[in-house]
Amino acid sequence: MSDSVSISVPYRNLRKEIELETVTKHRQNESGSSSFSESASPSNHSDSADGESVSKNCSLVTLVLSCTVAAGVQFGWALQLSLLTPYIQTLGISHAFSSFIWLCGPITGLVVQPFVGIWSDKCTSKYGRRRPFILVGSFMISIAVIIIGFSADIGYLLGDSKEHCSTFKGTRTRAAVVFIIGFWLLDLANNTVQGPARALLADLSGPDQRNTANAVFCLWMAIGNILGFSAGASGKWQEWFPFLTSRACCAACGNLKAAFLLAVVFLTICTLVTIYFAKEIPFTSNKPTRIQDSAPLLDDLQSKGLEHSKLNNGTANGIKYERVERDTDEQFGNSENEHQDETYVDGPGSVLVNLLTSLRHLPPAMHSVLIVMALTWLSWFPFFLFDTDWMGREVYHGDPTGDSLHMELYDQGVREGALGLLLNSVVLGISSFLIEPMCQRMGARVVWALSNFTVFACMAGTAVISLMSLSDDKNGIEYIMRGNETTRTAAVIVFALLGFPLAITYSVPFSVTAEVTADSGGGQGLAIGVLNLAIVIPQMIVSLGAGPWDQLFGGGNLPAFVLASVAAFAAGVIALQRLPTLSSSFKSTGFHIG
């Protein structure tokens, strides 16, 4: 296009020809300016002729060491996923309301990530744009997990019951409030770290290193998951560190406290390694932000870029653009105002509004993607919330607020559930290598549908296992103590098998979105943001409704799991009927919900 201009929009690539023209023009006008020569140098982090953040690849060792923080964050997330729903019930919060605490995840993900993304893009710290946020976020995670681990002791000091925790079965209100504060702070901190950590890797990796960088990042996440679930499954920490138990903090609490203190040590080491080896070049505020500075390592979604002639004020792809007119000869006359005419209202509020209003401008096929994605997460989130609780209650017949015998059975089930989640992570990691050939052979539409049908079968399997386990009650407590190895083994197998569809859920929908929106230019990045809405809104629905829904049918986790099975089946059917047939090409993507 002969008179196209580059404009400032969030997450965008500047047109190659425009940047080349800019460099040529500026060199002609100010060839003696050392400052420009420095900024136009191919080695500069922010400016390069090809529009990449880094024009020269960094070493593989640097890439590997620069994203170790992913393992530290994931370690804590694994403990959060496996231990915290059971633990909040030991503080007296009923099962019906235990799901409410998980509201913080989708809310902070929806609100915090746009703020952190924009602030890190504009950060002019001498330590770089991403590392300050990673450091602060990691510190917040450490504070949060310490608050959670010591919530019972803090509540005791603030006036909770002085009765020993082994005999007191009531609600410890102050401890529960402290726990919830720590839980929300933990989710906020997780979202503070994860976005800048991925953006840092995008900053450091060269154009031909994106797939490698993404694989390394996902590998560290898998390592963190495996270590975290292993820590949660041990159940022996309070025996190795008996001084962590107290009058307010019994065995389960001491185990949680020790595991989280280990998480603090591990996260600190990982963060320091990342901070040391990730060499960022400080950002100069008078330079426009590039797409790669903020792009997640999903795909080169903005490869087509935005092309606009001189625009009147208007809307395209759900984003409001202002008229951009300038004379090329005058553009470089005043370097101080070089980019003042490139304007975009990029506040966090504007980002959220754009995400909502852009629903009208998405390709028709994208609406089907959003429906399938929403149903997919309606099927997954009940499992994320209640997996180990289900193992402790339905499979092991335990009760977190019962007598010592039932509490021991419950704790044993929770540890077994954490072991199942460990196997789930292993299967997920192995399955991630199979997704690409499967998509090339069957197509992404069929693969996504297959994953949902697998979830349907597994969640239906939890119902069968629950009914089989409940039939053991008539055999008496001694039989329950010995346990039915068939049902317990089957439950662990279900946990492990769910790693296969989870790997697909973490990758294929984003590649489908990339292909469906491939012809919409800059709308692709916005479509990924809209896809996130199809994740967080179902999470909010499940967080608010799962506990009361279970209570409506007498308690337990079976009602929510049955509903999840129905949602998974519906997602599979709609995926086969409504999703478009896509090309067989597939680029693996990485994703995490936290």
Swiss-Prot record:
InterPro entries listed in its UniProt record: MFS, MFS_trans_sf
Bilayer topology term: Multi-pass membrane protein
| UniProt induction comment | By wounding.
| Residues bearing the modification N-acetylserine | 2
Region described as Disordered: 23-50
UniProt KW Transport keyword: yes
Residue ranges, compositional bias (Low complexity)? 31-46
Instruction: Please give the GO cellular component terms listed in this UniProt entry.
Output: Golgi apparatus; plasma membrane; pollen tube
Q: Which UniProt keywords apply?
A: Acetylation, Cell membrane, Glycoprotein, Membrane, Sugar transport, Symport, Transmembrane, Transmembrane helix, Transport
Q: Which PANTHER family match?
A: SOLUTE CARRIER FAMILY 45 MEMBER 3 ISOFORM X1 (PTHR19432:SF35), SUGAR TRANSPORTER (PTHR19432)
Q: What is this protein called?
A: Sucrose transport protein SUC3
Q: Which organism is it from?
A: Arabidopsis thaliana
What is the primary gene name for this protein? SUC3
